């Protein structure tokens, strides 16, 4: 990977009425990253945010050929299943590189993938609804621990932790 690197994390289950807003915000963050000198973009190729990010980066690559997209796939069978879908296979073929984190599935494989992306990135774009659990929340916490730049795109109604919720009678 050459140049500065940016990756994405976000939810798979997004409110349908927010998808256009999310895509617009992602496009803005990708454009801002490119303006800031980022040339390498990484995606875990999951459904939802990851796929939108891939499409948007590849659109921009048509006018800015120096941009590179790296697919970071958690395990080999996941890559095999992605390659069975024509559109996803085309997206993978457009990548500068495909990194497979490990050969076999283990419950921790998605955390390992997310960790790899953060460790190899200078900036992380997070599409996040405030949930304290799940892969996106863990990736955001890891981003903070690694002292990497984080750009958050809020989604829907932010879910407050219990201790911050207003008390009801």
Predicted ranges, named:
Residues 1-167:
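Acidic/glycine-enriched connector segments
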């Amino acid at each position: 990977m050459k140049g500065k690197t940016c990756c994405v994390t976000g939810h798979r289950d997004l409110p349908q009425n927010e998808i256009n807003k999310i895509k617009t915000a992602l496009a803005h963050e990708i454009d801002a990253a490119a303006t800031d000198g980022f040339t390498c973009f990484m995606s875990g190729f999951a459904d939802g945010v990851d796929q939108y990010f891939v499409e948007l980066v590849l659109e921009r690559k048509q006018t800015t050929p120096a941009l590179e997209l790296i697919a970071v796939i958690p395990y080999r069978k996941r890559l095999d299943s992605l390659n069975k879908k024509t559109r996803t296979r085309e997206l993978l073929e457009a990548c500068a590189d495909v990194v497979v984190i490990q050969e076999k599935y283990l419950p921790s494989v998605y955390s390992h993938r997310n960790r790899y992306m953060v460790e190899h990135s200078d900036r992380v774009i997070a599409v996040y609804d405030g949930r304290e659990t799940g892969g996106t929340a863990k990736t955001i916490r890891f981003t903070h621990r690694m002292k990497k730049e984080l750009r958050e795109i809020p989604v829907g109604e932010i879910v407050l932790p219990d201790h911050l919720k207003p008390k009801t009678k």
